[in-house]
């Protein structure tokens, strides 16, 4: 085998038919520049932003006692798995984008370790998102019952189980991934020149490729379908259902307060907080689907598509999907700090104090407070007594509250009957729900 001067040129073997055969199976040794340059740019950006954002999340949560909450405990675990996924996966992706695809330059152990760690950290991220969603679902929809199931000690056990389950689930991938070599074709077996193209008389020299074992197609399908169902389909169904339930509870919260007999006047700040929570919940579902669906679709196509019978157009679609899925796969980890933390005023304040420093933070909040006060003063109208508004308006301004009878302003007397106890319990529950939304 002759090594070409340009590393991206085809490998030249002693037999021309072998040269053509290898190229027909493995294709070009380097990614085309039209794909390599955008890949390097996007992967570099994701690596810098993702690692910085997730490390900031970890530092902010650790250094600020006000951030030591159950939700942030899950967020720190998620940030840890995302940092590991970015650090362990993206450098190798960058190397593959600017170097030859084959022969693989590293040992088989490194090949296995790379596949295992990438799969392991991605599983941990998905399961942590599920745990975080369960915690939010319980806290908002079942606030009284959530006190039984949510505690720091139990959260620690849950997070430990998440990492152990992810570790065990990723082990089969480590055993299935090997250094593959293109097997010798029938016309090259037991030929006088076979030793010139093969080291072992069975495979072609210089065709080492890190990937799942070519000869274990059934095992490939089992692992890929398992990952798709357990770590994408089921979490997607659960997350969507949980957040739809949360959205329904938040939208019905005002009417439930009104039916309970208690008058609640929602301020503009509380209304903005609720809208922010709704945006976060919708963004979580959309991000999960958008970032993970192309990756799993590409893997499913890779085990079901017969390249020998596929059209050139289908092949181009698959190649484009390969690059798109890689970008989406890692962008989920890079965007998690934004999706889970940027809408939280408490996190922004802690981030500014921890990362930017006290002086910059003081200037920022001083200007922000002045702008908010000016806006409030401009929007302030004549004061209308609350009782008069209750008599003359169907709703309380833009708060979309249900009509409130003037008699409800006198308070609600609860008797000892079972019916009144249930009403009182319901009122307490919705008070807790409303407080949860305000604290986000």
Label the predicted regions.
Residues 32-44, 67-134, 138-152:
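Extracellular TM2-ECL1-early TM3 structural module of rhodopsin-like
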Residues 41, 45-48, 77-80, 91, ...:
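Hydrophobic residues within alpha-helical transmembrane segments
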Residues 43-46, 84-101, 115-118, 122-129, ...:
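Helix-to-loop junction signature of class
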Residues 63-73, 136-158, 240-280, 303-315, ...:
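Intracellular signaling interfaces of 7-transmembrane GPCRs
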Residues 51-62, 87-91, 120-144, 158-160, ...:
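Cytoplasm-facing ends of alpha-helical transmembrane segments in multi-pass membrane proteins
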Residues 19-29, 97-120, 148, 153-156, ...:
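Loop architecture of class A 7-transmembrane GPCRs
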Residues 1-27, 182-204, 255-278, 311, ...:
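Intrinsically disordered regulatory tails of 7TM GPCRs
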Residues 192-220, 228-231, 248-295:
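Intracellular effector-coupling site of seven-transmembrane GPCRs
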């Amino acid at each position: 085998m002759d090594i070409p001067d340009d590393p991206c040129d085809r490998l030249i073997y002693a037999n021309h038919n072998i040269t053509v055969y290898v190229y027909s199976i493995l294709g070009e040794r380097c990614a085309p520049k039209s794909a390599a340059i955008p890949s390097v740019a996007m992967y570099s950006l994701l690596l810098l932003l993702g690692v910085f954002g997730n490390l900031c999340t970890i530092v902010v949560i650790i250094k600020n006692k006000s951030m030591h909450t159950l939700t942030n405990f899950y967020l720190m675990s998620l940030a840890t798995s995302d940092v590991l996924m970015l650090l362990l996966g993206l450098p190798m992706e960058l190397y593959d984008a600017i170097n030859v695809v084959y022969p693989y330059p590293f040992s088989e152990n490194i090949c296995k370790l790379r596949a295992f760690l990438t799969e392991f950290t991605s599983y941990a991220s998905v399961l942590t998102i599920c745990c975080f969603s369960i915690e939010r679902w319980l806290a908002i929809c079942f606030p009284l019952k959530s006190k039984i199931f949510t505690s720091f000690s139990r959260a620690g056990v849950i997070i430990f189980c998440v990492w152990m389950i992810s570790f065990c689930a990723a082990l089969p991938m480590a055993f299935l991934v090997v250094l593959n070599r293109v097997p010798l074709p029938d016309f090259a077996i037991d030929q006088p020149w076979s030793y010139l193209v093969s080291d072992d008389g069975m495979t072609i020299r210089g065709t080492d490729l890190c990937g799942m074992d070519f000869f274990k197609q059934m095992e490939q399908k089992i692992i890929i379908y398992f990952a798709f169902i357990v770590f994408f389909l089921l979490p997607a169904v659960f997350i969507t259902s949980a957040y739809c339930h949360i959205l329904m509870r938040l939208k019905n919260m005002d009417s439930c307060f009104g039916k309970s007999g208690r008058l609640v006047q929602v301020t503009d700040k509380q209304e903005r907080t609720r809208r922010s929570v709704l945006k976060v919940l919708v963004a979580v579902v959309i991000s999960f689907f958008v970032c993970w669906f192309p990756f799993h679709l590409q893997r499913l196509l890779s085990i079901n598509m017969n390249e020998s019978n596929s059209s050139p157009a289908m092949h181009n679609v698959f190649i484009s999907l390969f690059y798109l899925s890689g970008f989406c796969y890692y962008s989920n980890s890079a965007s998690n700090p934004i999706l889970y933390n940027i809408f939280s005023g408490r996190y922004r304040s802690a981030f500014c104090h921890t990362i930017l420093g006290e002086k910059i933070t003081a200037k920022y909040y001083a200007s922000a407070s002045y702008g908010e006060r000016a806006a409030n003063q401009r929007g302030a109208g004549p004061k209308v007594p609350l009782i008069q508004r209750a008599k003359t308006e169907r709703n309380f301004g833009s708060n979309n509250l249900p009509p409130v009878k003037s008699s409800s302003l006198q308070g609600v007397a609860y008797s000892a009957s079972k019916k009144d106890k249930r009403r009182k319990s319901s009122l307490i529950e919705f008070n807790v729900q409303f407080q949860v939304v305000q604290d986000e």
